[in-house]
């Protein structure tokens, strides 16, 4: 990412091989296999802004992260949870599902975990 602005004229797109396995639900696998290199400059700026403003987040937060995610760093959930000021926060760790985990074989499990987390957060707020 740091050299994206210099690379953009010579390498217009950052691309990767589409994942070919049973991790994603085929009916919903409309993922992308690349993005414009110049967008990486914006992405880097947005990540920096987001990290600097995590302290403003006070609502319940459940981070969902997979060991199979090749897009984000393994410490991303920890960075987020350490930065937010939420009273109610947690992490749902998945194994071997890709970045777009909501359309993976874990989709139903994620939906159930989110429902449980936010119901418990609401009950906690009422108490």
Say what each PLM segment does:
Residues 70-76:
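Conserved alpha/beta-hydrolase "acid-adjacent" motif
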Residues 57, 63-65, 69:
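Short beta-strand/loop motif that positions the catalytic acidic residue
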Residues 54-58, 83-86:
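Short, conserved loop/helix-junction motifs that constitute active-site signature segments
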Residues 90-127:
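Catalytic active-site module of serine/aspartate enzymes centered on a nucleophile-bearing elbow/loop
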Residues 21-34:
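Short glycine/proline- and acidic residue-enriched helix-loop micro-motifs
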Residues 36-53:
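Active-site nucleophile elbow and catalytic-triad environment of alpha/beta-hydrolase enzymes
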């Amino acid at each position: 990412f740091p050299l994206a602005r210099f690379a953009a004229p010579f390498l217009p797109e950052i691309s990767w091989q589409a994942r070919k396995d049973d991790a994603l639900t085929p009916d919903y696998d409309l993922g992308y296999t690349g993005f414009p290199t110049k967008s990486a400059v914006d992405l880097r700026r947005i990540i920096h802004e987001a990290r600097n403003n995590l302290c403003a987040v006070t609502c319940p937060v459940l981070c969902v992260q997979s060991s199979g995610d090749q897009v984000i760093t393994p410490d991303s959930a920890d960075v987020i949870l350490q930065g937010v000021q939420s009273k109610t926060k947690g992490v749902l760790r998945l194994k071997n599902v890709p970045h777009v985990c909501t359309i993976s074989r874990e989709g139903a499990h994620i939906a159930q975990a989110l429902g449980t987390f936010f119901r418990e957060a609401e009950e906690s707020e009422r108490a």
